[in-house]
Amino acid sequence: MAFRVGLPIAVFLAVILAPNPDGLTDQGQRALAVMAMAVVLWATETLHMAVTGMVSIVALTLINAVDDVSVALYGFSQPVTYFLVGILTLGMAVHRSGLAERMAAHLIRFAGGNPKLLYVQMLAAFAGLTFALPSASTRGAIMVHVYEQVMEHWGVEKTAPLNKAIMMAMGGLNRLGSTALLAGGITPVVASALIADFGGIDAFSWTRWFILMAVPFYLVLIFGGLVVYLMFRSGFTLPPGAGTVDLKTGPIQTKEIKAGLIALGTALLWFTDFAHGLSPAVPALIAMTIILLPGVGLLTWREFETNMGWANFFVIASSLSLANALIISGAAAWFADTLVGSVEGLRGHPTLILLAMSGAAAMVRAVMPNISGYLAFIIPVAMSTGSALGLNPVVCGLAVVVVGDSVVYYPASATASVFIYQRAEIRAPEVVRMGIFMTVIAVGVLFTIVLPYWSMVGESLTP
């Protein structure tokens, strides 16, 4: 414990007390010291990730790494932060109404007694259920119990290959369906805000994000699903006597109808943003307001404030504040210039530059399990470096999101995964092996399919 506490303090002091390098302002050095401390805290998980965020905000203010406290609290003033609160509230309402579990049960019924069809439908549900239930953690919490019922009915042991395949996919691939949607939870929310800020572009609309990210993440989901199937293919034959599962759901209730109508109306507003021009945060906040209205909605204020998961709010706001401090202090530009000098020989070879960037992103992800910390660190660096070397910074930002969010290297590295791996008794070496496979898949898909596709939709690698 002493090491985990002492290391971030030592890193902070080492950066802030070092001689000021050429081109880096005093304020930039202080901002870099706070970011370095936050990165180590996120990587070691010495503090809860939300507490790390708040420590960083306080540190930015106390050591004058920003001009004033309003700059330190930049992330708390951004619409994207409240967009996240809105979609989490919508997900909570759908979950508590019972609608999400009913949808999952109906999907499983279609598989009958065929484990291969069950597996394929589960992969499809990772994408389909995201429209009603954005949080991968909540989806996993619902689906794991439903699929455990199926395994129990079929007489499949926890350590059997079929159960491991189902749970490995649920732990390692489930969240890929979320990131394809702007409303898919903390990863797309943080990533889209950072890329828009650093790219100097308008905030991503729901449809623009879907156009750019659905192809890479759905392809990674498909290929990742194939890898899991091949790893455990011996289990996709049912024991003798196993048959169709009949999951009881009961009659549909009024609260489920309400949840479905609210989710459908919100989705329609997101789908039609090209017509009305509303920020994605507005439909999310409308849904949140309806859900909390007495007599009309689905949640009381007490239920909302108790179950919202406020850590997500503080993590995203503090991540945006840290990234903004790096920008306005000049630290991000200095860091990028330093990296440019080390890869100057690759100038004129944009594909090789992005390949090196992707490899570096995978290594950063391996030592930084917290996705918000990873994004807050890697997106500013990747976009600034790419821009300095003549690459499209938006593509660089999107690329490191694809690489970083496609992998899980440790059982405890993602909230959506840890409890699933534990229940299925999946060992750490199996997760590491899957993480390596997913890294290769993500990079391969990115360079063979996604880059040409992005160029077709207006985001080429070189501007």
What residue ranges belong to the model's regions?
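Interfacial loop-to-helix junctions that mark the boundaries of transmembrane helices
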Residues: 22-30, 41-46, 69-79, 203-215, ...
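Flexible hinge motifs at transmembrane-helix junctions and intramembrane kinks/re-entrant loops
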Residues: 22-27, 36-55, 226, 252-257, ...
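Juxtamembrane helix-boundary/capping and inter-helix hinge elements in multi-pass membrane proteins
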Residues: 63-66, 96-100, 109-113, 150-164, ...
